[in-house]
Amino acid sequence: MTETMKHTLLFVFVGVMILLEGMTDFLFFSGSWNSALVILNMGLISAIMAIGVNIQWGFAGLFNVGIMGFTALGGLAVVLVSTPVIPAAWSSGGVSIVMALVMGALTVVAAVMITKFMPAGKLRALVLAVVLIAGFFVYRAIFDPAVGSVEAINPALQGNIGGLGLPVLLAWPAGGLLAAGAAWLIGKTALGLRSDYLAIATLGIAEIIIAVLKNEDWLSRGVKNVVGLPRPLPYEVDLQSDPSFVERAASWGIDPVTASTVYVKAGYALMFTVVLLALLWMAQMALKSPWGRMMRAIRDNETAAEAMGKDVTRRHLQIFVLGSAICGIAGAMMTTLDSQMTPGTYNPLRFTFLIWVMVIVGGSGNNFGAVLGGMLIWFFWIKVEPMGILLMELVTSGMAEGSALKAHLLESASHMRLFTMGLILLLVLRFSPRGLIPEK
Amino acid sequence: MDLLNALVALTNFVIVPGLAYGSQLALGALGVTLIYGILRFSNFAHGDTMAFGAMVTILFTWLFQSVGLSAGPLPTALLALPFGILGTIALALVTDRTVYRFYRQQKAKPVIFVMVSLGVMFMMNGIVRFIIGPGDQRFTDGERFVISARTFKKLTGLQEGLAIKTTEALTVITAVIVVAVLFWFLNKTRTGKSMRAYSDNEDLALLSGINPERVVMYTWMIVAALATIAGVLYGLDKSFKPFTYFQLLLPIFASAIVGGLGNPIGAIAGGFIIAFSEVTITYAWKKVLNYSLPDSLAPDGLVQLLSTDYKFAVSFAILIVVLLFKPTGLFKGKAV
Amino acid sequence: MSDNPYQDDHGNKDASITNVKGIGTMQPAHLKSGPTHKVEGGPFLIGDTMTGGYGKGPDILHDCTIAVDKGEIAVIVGPNGAGKSTAMKAVFGMLNVRSGAVRLDGEDITQLTPQDRVVKGMGFVPQTSNIFTSMTVEENLEMGAFIRTDDFRDTMEQVYDLFPILRDKRNQPAGELSGGQRQQVAVGRALMTKPKVLMLDEPTAGVSPIVMDELFDRIIEVARTGLPILMVEQNAKQALEIADKGYVLVQGRNAYTGTGKELLADPEVRKSFLGG
């Protein structure tokens, strides 16, 4: 069997699994097209995130453990771009908030300038401290009252500065830009240090981003969530009340409710596939371009590349920003799919480390591997739970009815998920360390 | 103005909790730093190792409580701790045998070990949730306070109370003992010195007849013990929840890096720096300022620099500042 | 990309998650020791007609023979890239010796790992990274004696007598010492095992001429105690002056062999390697 055939078969396997999910309720499959499409959609989004991380890790060896943060920024972009404008919020405090943020940014810039241009010594430390402390208090003095007044506006539904009221699809590139901006800041700091401290920096920043989203109610309503975000596709209820749609569904022999949900989800699947294919194509082109060859040259021998006059830090920063932007786009797509922004649900295990499992299992350095890993691992992530319950039922079938152990085992079966992900990762790292579709 | 009351308030809300949290972070960071120094990678599974150790201890605590065994005024968990440590050592050694050793034989790069530790992290996380569930568990018993706020007020006649929880006192005392024993071990015993030698220069250690596998085994045993103690102390002081332990990774890594990765003294200093920064920056200073400033200057607001939800941000900001000025950490990294 | 997938780090250099300082780089020929057997006669230590290279790589040494007897100093010299250090590493078991043998004190040890050769009595001082920089001088010596189960205080005293400066600096981290002092620590560490033979890989690399002379004096002093010394040297002239035996290697082969004096007097050797 040739390599290409093996790799094609792997993709076919994932496809068949998802088809089976829709067709049959045998074993752990649910037999619902709805559920199959849900898995497919999140699988596509996961594949995009995996491409983003793969670009960073596979091509440049950058260890990003802050994927969650970039994903969440993508989600924030959806809120800021697509929710309706709230004029009252802008007139009451929105402008002051922006001013305060600019003040804060200026303070940081001033601090950086001072460290750069003043000679080191006690004077510099003093000036730095004064600037930072004064800046902080001025910022808080403008910021706090403004936030108070914004949050007071219709708090049950809004209480935030709202968005721009633009079409939600614009939020996807905006999410990419937002993530890219954050990545640039992080990369500039963490890659510019004498040794590279990217991992801990991304780990920390991701937590900070989530903390900001959870607490700054004026921005994205914090843990009160933003629900009912605009969608690029029609609502199911509208479809169900549309006579022509109902008629068409009837001609296929499907009831209108199922038809409408499947129609919407299939629509998303189509859109996501387009984005995935576009990004995949771009990533492949970039990889084959002189730029991609240079990236790999740097990765394989940084010292030699440096000696040839390549600015390694700059290149690393570039690729870090690009990869994070892709994660931001995926994050925006995910929030669009959910049509809600729920900062409380971001969890590093799910949004950072699971993506890493996808990249490693798929094959670090290979974009197709990343896509495969994203889809495959996502399928397992969803399906391990029913599989675990099935397994536990089998294991406990011999036990006495009502025994405490049996109850505990059945109840805990759902926690098999994390365990299984770890097991898959370890097995792949051990027996197929280059992943399912290795880099060529 | 009432400086004495201000001091008591400061001690009560900042110094005592800071000391306890700092000790917990320091113990956690010591484990991370030892693995980094000797096995040469950052162990992402450390938080979950702590959770596992705490879990085993909790199970034994429940067992002891059910048969009526107790440590008098001290938490029963202290009696269960040795069993927790043994269980965690067993887990660490089994993990090393079945997982990590293979990569050592392959002379795998440290970053591969990091990825492997991600897998171990997932699995341990799953095991802990599988056995004890994802929920909150409280297992503190015995006397709640060494000195309660009311007793303190009665004793001193001050307006402000000072409460020291048994768990806080226990945390600090245990941490001091553990750290003293650890440093004695590393600096005075033959095995401890061989561990430092291996960390310093692997090849030369090999040529001196030091057996790497033994060094690694001792390291895992010590790290498992440290993780269990840190996990149990944290759980006693706050509460036990698997996810919280996983999230402790960030402040623990930050402590280890701020102090200088690979340097045990740095890990301890880093733990306290991070803990005190978190506590002071997220504490509402109104009370202390009200006592220490003349009435005319008394603040209106809470004088809280950042809300408590930003404590991660604080650890991280400190980290960046330290790295900008001292890239190897405050205590030059790498001197296990 | 590395051939071994487990060694492929994608060029990652993240100091917050990986620690490469002091990481092992040694590539011993054997990971597990094979059998040894007794042999009769021959010099005390000999690498006999060794041919071999690193791992599966091409041969670097070709029928190269290096030997040293009790009470002797043997010196390996030659131009850059001649395989001087390689020859010594072959004797120490860091090179895949495909044909030929290494014999020490009447025993064929070709199949042993470097660690086991240390146990058999080889004291080896690498050219670089030859001390534990974060540990005190005394701890360095203690680690040298790690394989010994008997009382090693006498040996430590002997080392201090040989290198008095180390006694003064015994509680100072070895990494804080000067280059010459570090080399003394390195030699002292190797002496702590009470080796039967001492192997030094360019002990004077990177030290000033004055320190170099002092180091050579010490090495002679060690040799006077009866310990055979095998040494690779960049400074051919000085080295041959103190050598009982000299080996001039060229491209992994023995070019000239003789006593130190003979080689110094040999016009060919002088012209080619000693600058006239």
Predicted regions and their residues:
Chain B
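Membrane-interfacial amphipathic/re-entrant helices at transmembrane-helix boundaries
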Residues: 1-28, 56, 67-79, 106-111, ...
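Inter-helical junctions in multi-pass inner-membrane proteins, predominant
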Residues: 5-24, 185-190, 216-262, 279-289, ...
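Single transmembrane alpha-helix segments in multi-pass membrane proteins
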Residues: 10-60, 94, 98-112, 203, ...
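Membrane-embedded helix boundary and interhelical linker motif in transport proteins
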Residues: 16, 39, 45-94, 158-161, ...
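Helix-loop-helix "hairpin" substructures at the membrane interface of multi-pass membrane proteins
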Residues: 21, 160-240, 245, 264-270
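Alpha-helical transmembrane segments within multi-pass membrane transporters and channels
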Residues: 68-120, 269-273, 278, 323-327
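Hydrophobic alpha-helical transmembrane segments of polytopic membrane proteins
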Residues: 88-90, 250-274, 315-325, 330
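Transmembrane helix-bundle core of multi-pass membrane transporters
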Residues: 102-103, 111-188, 215, 283-312, ...
